[in-house]
A protein has these predicted regions:
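Transmembrane-helix motifs of polytopic, lipid-linked glycan transferases
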Residues: 104-143, 160, 183
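Extracytosolic helix-loop segments that constitute the early lumenal/periplasmic catalytic or substrate-binding loops
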Residues: 49-73, 80, 87-90
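Loop-to-helix entry region of an early transmembrane alpha helix in multi-pass inner-membrane enzymes
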Residues: 79, 83, 92-120, 147-148, ...
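Membrane-interface transmembrane helices that cradle and orient dolichyl/undecaprenyl
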Residues: 145, 149, 184-201, 206-209, ...
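Short periplasmic/luminal acceptor-recognition loop of GT-C membrane glycosyltransferases, typified by
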Residues: 70, 429-446, 451-564
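Transmembrane-lumen/periplasm boundary regions of multi-pass, lipid-linked membrane glycan transferases
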Residues: 48-59, 204-329, 333-349, 361, ...
């Protein structure tokens, strides 16, 4: 039946039918917008990053070049994401508000990440050695259509990755890190077609890796890129030195903008700051431990679902052609990231996020090579599990408002006991329309031909996006009350004003600088000076002080105490 069996993939013209671009764009927007434009900050890492962004916005060039919180140097929050957040606050803070403007950095990195993943996959899939077998009967997919559908699959699987559901919406350095690894993989794919431009893009990603993560990731990616350019057979016919010069020049230029800016703004402080930065980099690395490896293996499986299984399926399908460029290069990127992850002290979700872009490229090919039973498994999982989750969200929302059934009501009530359920007609309408759209997708799934290659990833991405919209739309204020510090700050401010008298400030000696900055932003007059009132974060109450109130989020074991001397 086939003319050639040199590839494990088969793709007909019908199976590579074009996914409507409007539908894809709507899905990308629908996935990321919930939790970006209408929420408070949910985690301590977001609050820490936001406090540093506020220091930049309200400070001078020194605060931009050498990130700090009230003069205390900040090394954990990497500058790339902070610069973008502060820049958006400067540009749009007057229009959107400081919090929303800062979160535009998430939208910025998300846009580039999705673009890098799609175009990186496109460049790998367009190569002759990546093409599927030619059909003896029937029309085979054209290289352009095949590259497009593999790119769509990779991008849809990225959107449908369960582990990215929350981290991809948080104002944290990991959102810049995942963009950098996507750009790095894209640069390698682009270099196959445009050697100099691709090498420049790869080098820029290496320099940005230091700004988005740490020095060691940048060095490992640099060594990996040099090795790939020297040894990968696809690059051998091309002149080596121009590519290496472009690679190293771009990496050096992007990184050294930072220290040069530090010297330009404050040569007096730069030595001490960079010494602290270097000590922080040394503290980041450690020898691999069985505990860390076990943690990554245990959490990695669910974090990368459904990308992981299809990536492994791709490697199995190409086990006899593992040296092909479209498989070998993303796999080598994963290997470089694995070396970095092994030596990082206390790995976390951010480490796992870095693996997603090259893994999605392999998973995109894996979808094309998968048997129909495996593709149907993704269909079944998306259709059944996501439909049940959407149904459960509506049932819990109704129970929260009517108080029945009692068990469901109390499950929601205990998340924010002080919050009174309110009905927001606009958001309920949006969620209802989203539910109808999901039902329409399910009907399309039941009635549509099974031969379209992007059907399974489309269902996964659409299901995750629908859940995001419905969860935030129905329970946005509940999530804010449970996870945000703003309601806590509002209660402290209300009690302070009720008991203020002639007092003008609240002593904050026992709070860290990040807490002081974001609580000040929400109106609390915190000072590190003698004040009649004092805000502490401890279970011990000072003698001779009157307790005005206790304040904490429902999820916190310990909160704040406002004292009056």
């Amino acid at each position: 039946m086939f003319v050639d069996r040199s590839s494990p993939m088969v793709a007909s013209a019908i199976s590579t039918s074009k996914l409507p671009r409007i539908a894809l764009l709507a899905l990308l927007v629908g996935f990321i917008c919930p939790g970006i434009l209408s929420r408070d900050f949910w985690g301590s890492s977001e609050l820490s990053a936001f406090s540093t962004i506020l220091s930049m916005v309200n400070g001078t060039g020194i605060d931009w070049a050498l990130p700090n919180d009230l003069g205390v140097n900040e090394y954990a929050d990497t500058p790339l994401m902070l610069w973008c957040g502060a820049a958006f606050v400067k540009l749009f803070g007057w229009l959107l508000g400081t919090e929303v403007a800062a979160r535009l950095a998430i939208l910025f990195f998300y846009t580039f990440t999705t673009g890098f993943i799609w175009y990186g996959t496109w460049y790998f899939a367009r190569r002759d050695e990546a093409q599927p077998v030619a059909l003896a009967f029937g029309k085979s997919a054209s290289p352009r259509a095949y590259g497009r559908v593999v790119g769509d699959n990779a991008l849809l699987l990225f959107i449908g990755t369960l582990g990215l559901f929350i981290p991809l919406r948080e104002l944290d350095s990991e959102i810049a890190l995942i963009c950098v690894t996507a750009a790095y993989t894209f640069g390698l794919g682009w270099a196959l077609w445009h050697p100099k431009w691709g090498s420049l893009a790869t080098g820029a990603a290496i320099g940005a890796a230091i700004l988005a993560s740490d020095l060691w990731l940048g060095l490992i990616l640099l060594v990996a890129a040099i090795y790939i350019h020297c040894r990968a057979h696809a690059f051998i016919p091309q002149p080596l030195m121009p590519r290496l010069v472009c690679l190293i020049l771009a990496a050096s230029t992007v990184f050294f903008v930072w220290p040069i800016a530090g010297v330009a703004f404050t040569i007096e402080l730069v030595d001490a700051w960079w010494l602290g930065w270097w000590q922080h980099q040394i503290a980041l690395i450690d020898l691999p431990s069985s505990k860390d490896i076990t943690w990554m293996l245990k959490n990695g499986f669910w974090f990368v679902w459904p990308v992981g299984p299809f990536m492994l399926g791709c490697l199995y399908a190409f086990r006899k052609q593992i040296g092909r460029t479209h498989i070998k290069l993303p796999l080598m990127v994963l290997g470089a990231l694995a070396v970095w992850a092994l030596f990082v002290r206390n790995p976390n979700e951010g480490i796992l996020m870095a693996f997603i872009p090259p893994a999605t490229i392999l998973a995109g090919f894996g979808m094309m090579a998968a048997r129909r039973s495996w593709s149907s498994l993704l269909d079944w999982f998306s259709s059944s599990v996501f439909s049940l989750i959407i149904l459960a969200l509506w049932l819990y929302y109704i129970a929260w408002h009517i108080g029945m059934p009692p068990k469901m009501y109390h499950s929601v009530y205990k998340l924010a006991p002080m919050l009174t359920p309110t009905f927001h007609g606009f958001w309920v309408g949006v969620c209802f329309a989203t539910t109808l759209a999901w039902i329409a997708v399910m009907m399309w799934r039941l009635n549509h031909a099974k031969s379209i290659a992007w059907r399974g990833p489309w269902l996964a991405a659409a299901g995750v996006s629908a859940i995001a919209i419905i969860a935030v739309g129905l329970f946005g204020n509940l999530i804010d009350a449970n996870r945000s510090m703003k309601p806590v700050a509002d209660r402290i401010l209300a009690d302070f004003k009720a008991n203020q008298g002639t007092a003008q400030c609240i002593n904050a000696d026992e709070l860290d600088n990040a807490q002081i900055i974001y609580l000040r932003h929400w109106g609390l007059p915190l000072e590190k000076a003698q004040c009649e009132f004092k805000l502490v974060q401890t279970a011990r109450v000072e003698q001779g002080s009157e307790v005005i109130g206790y304040y904490n989020r429902p999820r916190d074991r310990h909160g704040f105490i406002l004292l009056k001397k």
